[in-house]
Amino acid sequence: TLVLALAATCGTLAQTPDPAVMARIRDEGMNHSQVMKTLSYLSDVIGPRLTGSPSLKRANEWTRDTLTSWGLKNARLEAWGPFGRGWQLDRFSCQVSAPQDIPLIAYPKAWSPSLRGPVTADVVLIDVKDAAELQKFKGQLKGKIVMSGGEQPLAAHFTPQGTRFTDEQLLAMAEAQAQAPGRGGGGGGAGGGQGRRAGAGGQGGQGAQGQRGGAGGQGQRPGQFRGPNLSGAILRLAMDEGAIAVIDGSRGDDGTIFVQSAAVPPPAVNPSMAAPAREAGAASGTAPASGAQPPRRGPSVWDKSAPKTLPQVTVSSEQYNRMARMIGFGEKLKISLDLKTEFFDRDPMAYNTVAEIPGTDLHDQIVMVGGHMDSWHSGTGATDNGAGVAVAMEAVRILQALNLQPRRTIRVALWSGEEEGLFGSRNYVAQHFGSYASNPPSAAFGGGGGAATRGPLTKGADYDKISAYFNLDNGTGKIRGIYCQGNTAVESIFADWLKPFADLGAGTITIRNTGSTDHVSFDAIGIPGFQFIQDVIEYNTRTHHSNQDVFDRVQGDDLKQAAVIEAAFLYNTAMRDEMLPRKPAQGD
């Protein structure tokens, strides 16, 4: 009788949060946190972590060793790929040298090739409305630096660039209806999916919603080129005509520049037959962000067999506009440019860092948490997504430090290749849990709601052993709730789990999807995969894929709160009698 009573008591505790354990998690995370120390080393010491680069490999090894030093088991690097070529910036300078000296706020795009040495060259501005107008520049570009696109007016800022969700916005997220299966929410930019049922109120400010850009050829602001894909056509012409480099203006302002990867020149086409432009920010050679993706459309710049391209540089919008206006007045500009980069072809594979807290009676079952460790290169990857990595590491550190004994194994995974197309998590999911034959892990995915991904599904050995995956990848903002990804069965469970943290501002339960980050890789094959709702702060306006993605833009108290809540969700998931319920399979 005593054994039965104890078993019943343990079962009850496994279904509802244990207040004493929640209090211990909170105390450890708020009063003994290491999250900012972890993030500072990752972003300040290791720095930017482009997929395939030596810096990312160093981050893989440092996180593996750090997790081991905290007492986690089976810490390792798991390879995926082949990815392609690594790249790093060794030396760069850029300034207008005539008719006057103007030091430029600028950054080369990733995977840009080197120049043969420092050069000073005349500047040619190409500001046209359609591809047919490019013909007049033939014979004028050899040995020149090309400015791609004209002046873009900038608006003053009359609203705060840093915001938190208001009570009204959280309520709207809570009351929204579920989306049709397979339809992605707005991208992971700042909470662009909305939801149903809310709890704790927010703090003042206006939260923006945003869609994350894709991986390639970015720099110009959306809408800079209308009609045919003039940016690609300009690059093609510059390449064919023997130009030295191509520069464009950033979509940012106030000296903030948003920089991603260089573009591969498109195949030469008749200007009158030019294809329509892809959505701004879409990756060169990768599928657009939508529900069911077609295969990639040709080589990406990081592919070992990618066609040659020109050095490509993004300049701050204010300075780019000034140069365009000077040329409009008839000034003859020269730019002095020096660019030395390095490619790494020896190891085409990329790596995820993985470590575990072993479970007890249900040790064969898994609860996962993670964030992507790769970043773009102009900042140090602090908010995208060093913050999510540091929070995931801190969450498992908290549980390990408290010597809690989870029933299920808790596994932390720190991904690579997210910025290029969720490649690290998608390959991991395919290797361990399953995949759709018609949607291989090399194809990029964007929106949420992945259960509509094409079948049939081939299940891996651990498909039925994983309870859930939790992700954080919307910058530095604290957790305000969680996206349920259309899984109505988890709403009440998550609502109970958030109650102990209502005073910390977390309480919104949203049925809607959000996409464009690594939880989608799990959700796409029917595994419960969740992204937390985060306050926007400056993510869309200032730090996301920019040179301002640095440690100083991070809010330490927000990350402490996020790590506490993430640790609590991991513990509660690990202690339940049953795994978290899954959404019905398509066709059920």
Regions found by a protein language model. Give the residues of each.
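Bacterial N-terminal signal peptides
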Residues: 1-11
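Noncatalytic luminal/extracellular "stalk/propeptide" segments of secretory-pathway proteins
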Residues: 16-18, 40, 44-184
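N-terminal capping segment at the start of a domain
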Residues: 17-53, 374-375, 471-477, 540-546
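Disordered, low-complexity segments in secreted/periplasmic proteins that are enriched in proline
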Residues: 173-228, 262-300, 439-457
